Amino acid sequence: MKSPTPALMLQGTSSNAGKSILTAAFCRILLQDGYRVAPFKAQNMALNSHVTADGLELGRAQAVQAAACRLDVDVRMNPVLLKPNSDTGSQVVVMGRPVGNMRVREYMAYKPVAFDAARAAYDSLAADVDVMVLEGAGSPAEVNLKAHDIVNMAMARHAEAKVLLVGDIDRGGVFASLVGTMELLDPWERDLVAGFVLNKFRGDATLLSPAYDVVTGRTGKPFLGVVPWLHDLGLPDEDSVSFRETLAGRAPDVPAGGGMLDIVLVDLPHISNFTDLDALRREPDVAVRVVRSPEQLGSPDAIILPGSKNTLGDLAALRSRGMAEALCALRSADGGHLGPVIVGICGGFQMMGRLLADPQGVESDHARTEAGLGLLPVTTEMGSAKVLRRTSAKTVSGWCGAGVAAGLMPGTGGGHGGAEACPGEGYAVHGYEIHHGVTTPDAGGGAVLVCLHESDGSPAGWTTPDGQVWGTYLHGVFDADGFRRGWLDALRVRRGLEPVGRIVARYDLDPALDRLADAVRGAVDMTHVYSLLGLPPQG
């Protein structure tokens, strides 16, 4: 009988302990040392997802981990994806395709089927590589959930993985969390734990030695490393908790004449694919902040309505908070000279339209039709078929996504180098679509222009004639360095600032993954890790 593929698994004492990032780090370290390595997470609960080349959906974190391995994204890396669409239910995606919406008890009954799919995916993927790096979810010691576990110790046992238990020391109480987690594990689960890793440490690590002795004395498990707090990694946040924490509390306005652009992301209860903002956050002349109420809006240069897993529900939330009225009020009536540019992506794009219809009850248990924000004269009809595809598109000649008010559209002049900022041949953009529903311009409902188109001429984005409002289904539209800088420079001209005129920040995860790997390699006893895996270091 063939020996199992060596496997390392990162589990945590809590959510947001850093499992996803550390999984990516170990993937890149093993790759650097000459091993064929692949990531795996049996079940991911996330609204950040990614589409494979063959049109299948999986968690975004596994796409980043695949990049760490320099592999194409493969749905086997995350065979089960749960996308919450209410407080008690989720869309269940198995091997990249939705199998239905389920409430908690329904999914509990379905879990044996999901676990079969996860094990089969793991076995198939593991057969293709030298070593696997698995990621757990939440905590393995949730006593009310352990009986139905398919992602933590049950998966570790199937993979015969060596488990490293990760604790977030920045939040305090990490040693109690480690000991408490071990106490709540069954004996066979404790046997799978090979050691502890502390994450997000700030300070002098030598001061931790007394705690090591106490915890190791109680658990019999060694500490294999202390990973420092890593600033500005340039990698996507692993979940909405860390994303919101990162961007919360920013100043509501950029000082006039300060040279920085103020870009606002409207928070949604079921926000999805907030990684669409990652590339903008890397730009040195941009401040991105999350807002939840009209009072927080200030006077931004641009407002982005992001994707949503429950578009109609999140639209209702915007209305109840007063945000819908505030956004409409910011849509200036004088051709966009004063108001911010308003951008909708996927669900946010649907919300900006005149009407949203859900005749099949895709997002709820009954058919309904709701008025949209009315910012774009388009109508969306939800459908049971889910669009999952990668898309390449080009901007319409001369369009920069910031409107004619700044003189950046063809034939308007504008100065400040604006004409050079919007090339006649258009910008190439690439991304992916994940949505239910089809959006079409209203017949006679007001002017709307195509601003993005695919190679066959199919529209991929729409804008008002003045360019102040535009929307697209294309996730990753701002990842394109040229378009992103052109859009930002157009915003700068609207503000009366000089355009930068060149790409200053490239959105490239590979150097960031190398920096991450270097930091973790220097903080963790890799000789011990290799001995656990039964592998010699290579380099």
UniProtKB/Swiss-Prot annotation:
Disulfide-bond pairs as recorded: none
Protein name per UniProt: Cobyric acid synthase
PROSITE patterns reported for this sequence: GATASE_COBBQ (PS51274)
One Pfam family cited in the UniProt record for this chain: GATase_3
Function: Catalyzes amidations at positions B, D, E, and G on adenosylcobyrinic A,C-diamide. NH(2) groups are provided by glutamine, and one molecule of ATP is hydrogenolyzed for each amidation.
The family this protein is said to belong to: Belongs to the CobB/CobQ family. CobQ subfamily.
Xref: Gene3D superfamilies: 3.40.50.880, P-loop containing nucleotide triphosphate hydrolases
Span of domain GATase cobBQ-type: 260-483
Organism: Nitratidesulfovibrio vulgaris (strain DP4)
Record-linked NCBIfam families: cobQ, PRK00784.1
UniProt keyword annotations, A-Z: Cobalamin biosynthesis, Glutamine amidotransferase
Keyword Ion transport: no
Pathway this chain belongs to: Cofactor biosynthesis; adenosylcobalamin biosynthesis
Gene Ontology BP terms: cobalamin biosynthetic process
Residues annotated as the enzyme's active site: 346 (nucleophile), 475
UniProt-listed InterPro entries: Class_I_gatase-like (IPR029062), CobQ/CobB/MinD/ParA_Nub-bd_dom (IPR002586), CobQ_GATase1 (IPR033949), CobQ_N (IPR047045), CobQ_synth (IPR004459), GATase_3 (IPR011698), P-loop_NTPase (IPR027417)
A molecular-function term among this protein's GO annotations: ABC-type vitamin B12 transporter activity
